[in-house]
Curated annotation (Swiss-Prot):
SUPFAM superfamilies: Phosphoglucomutase, C-terminal domain, Phosphoglucomutase, first 3 domains
Protein residues bound to Mg(2+): 104, 241, 243, 245
Family label: Belongs to the phosphohexose mutase family.
The gene coding this protein: glmM
GO cellular component, one term: cytosol
Enzyme Commission number(s) from the entry: 5.4.2.10
Organism of derivation: Teredinibacter turnerae (strain ATCC 39867 / T7901)
Ranges annotated as spanning the membrane: none
The protein, known as: Phosphoglucosamine mutase
Phosphoserine: residues carrying this PTM: 104
Enzyme class: isomerase
Domain of life: Bacteria
Length: 446
């Protein structure tokens, strides 16, 4: 399907540029409302709107609200909430849809939206296509206007849901946890979840001002978390991104534990203590060491395209309940419908509790293969498969690794970059090849 507005993860861009304007968001809200009204007997029902902590979120919230109301749809306003919380609340309120205003791990100058259907799952391609078709039509106000209201205790509902995914009596008592909330949507929720389960919580990056979301903090900037874990002699550090659908850990030695390692810990726990793990979906970027570690436990593994939409699709096709990405998007489909940083973190802590080991000890069960990724900024699209210079460079890199590694080049679905990933047995060679390939890609797109 050729998309005009929607990317692999909704619509995203710099505020004030392209379609990231209040005018477009009002038109988009109206289009969403019209499509829902056509597909639901009750005329569109209720749509929930939540957001992260970007200052532009207020503007876009009001614009979407106006468009939806003009289409005759009622609106429930959740305020700042993690993306997975909005998916959960959409499902439990039996709302027609849920809308998230966020640009995830991007800086505050960016914003965008994600949409969930009534099951709390990202919209199907045909629904997005219908919305794109509608959004370009003249906006006509419905005969019956919708109404808007604030949703009471949305935060409390989600906190109780998170705690309820653990066995009765589960406790984090005696554990010191540093939680980095990226000055984003988890700033109020995450510390409460862990403290209410008994952990001693040291919360950092929990003072959003509208502009400091993801600024030198959160799951993409772990330096502060590593420092705080070591200085406070904490047992563990947990970092979320701006909208709370990604998570990364830091162990008691201050070492990063990424999404592949966290997925393996969860899968191994399910295999040993949870009645088995039917299979795990990773992505093209998943570390080969992750695949080998799962193979040793006889857990099936499949690679999907990058993007939680494709991970979930592969999970559904296989009937598996666990999948995710190296970046920390982890989907535990036995308890939720989308990537959820807090839920994934709780599953890791459950595994640590069962094994009675530290995170550093537990992660040793999976040996990562050296992997280097370089992001190459691009100003124009490049067909990688048809570019002779790029393909020659890839073939030469693979030949130099003598079949003991992987090369992957792919355009990002959320940023104007091409990601160059090289994986092999020797870090020095892997790093050299990755940067050489990045130079070739840079020349090809200049």
């Amino acid at each position: 399907m050729t998309r005009k507005y929607f990317g692999t993860d909704g619509i995203r861009g710099q505020v004030g540029q392209g379609v990231i304007t209040p005018q477009f968001f009002m038109q988009l809200g109206w289009a969403v409302g019209k499509v829902l009204a056509e597909r639901h007997a009750d005329g569109g029902g209720l749509v929930l709107i939540g957001k992260d902590t970007r200052i532009s979120g207020y503007m876009f919230e009001s614009a979407l609200e106006a468009g939806l109301i003009a289409a005759g749809v009622d609106v429930g306003l959740l305020g700042p909430m993690p993306t997975p919380a909005i998916a959960y609340l959409t499902r439990t309120f039996q709302a027609s849809a849920g809308i998230v205003i966020s640009a995830s791990h991007n800086p505050f100058r960016d914003n965008g939206i994600k949409l969930f259907n009534t099951q709390g799952v990202k919209l199907a391609d045909d629904v997005e296509a219908a919305i794109e078709h509608q959004v370009d039509r003249p906006m006509v106000t419905a005969e019956r206007l919708g109404k808007a209201r604030r949703v009471p205790d949305a935060e409390g509902r989600y906190i109780e849901f998170c705690k309820g995914t653990l066995p009765w009596g589960f406790s984090l008592a005696g554990l010191t946890v540093v939680v980095d909330c990226a000055n984003g949507a988890t700033y109020n929720v995450a510390p409460k979840v862990f403290s209410e389960l008994g952990a001693e919580v040291i919360a950092i990056s929990t003072h959003p001002d509208g502009e400091n979301i993801n600024l030198n903090c959160g799951s993409t900037k772990l330096n502060n978390l590593q420092k705080q874990v070591l200085e406070s002699h904490a047992d563990i550090g947990i970092a979320f991104d701006g909208d709370g659908d990604r998570v990364q850990f830091v162990d008691e030695r201050g070492e990063v534990v990424d999404g592949d390692q966290l997925l393996f810990i969860i899968a191994a726990h399910k295999q040993r203590h949870g009645g088995g793990c039917s299979g795990v979906v990773g992505t093209q970027m998943s570390n080969f060491g992750f695949e080998l570690a799962l193979e040793a436990l006889k857990i099936p593994f499949e690679r999907a395209k990058v993007g939680d939409r494709y991970v979930i699709e592969a999970m559904n096709n296989n009937g598996w309940k666990l999948g995710g990405e190296s970046s920390g998007h982890i989907v535990c489909a036995d308890v939720t419908t989308t990537g959820d940083g807090i839920i994934a973190a709780l599953q890791v802590l459950r595994a640590l509790n069962a094994e009675a080991q530290t995170l550093y000890e537990l992660k040793q069960r999976m040996q990562k293969m050296p992997q280097v990724m370089v992001n190459v900024p691009v100003k124009r699209k490049l067909n990688l498969e048809e570019n002779d210079m790029v393909q020659t460079a890839i073939a030469e890199a693979e030949q130099r690794m003598e079949g003991q590694g992987r090369v992957l080049l792919r355009p990002s679905g959320t940023e104007p970059v091409i990601r160059v990933m090289v994986e092999g047995q020797q870090h020095g060679m892997v790093s050299q090849l990755a940067h050489e390939l990045a130079e070739v890609v840079g020349r090809a797109t200049s």
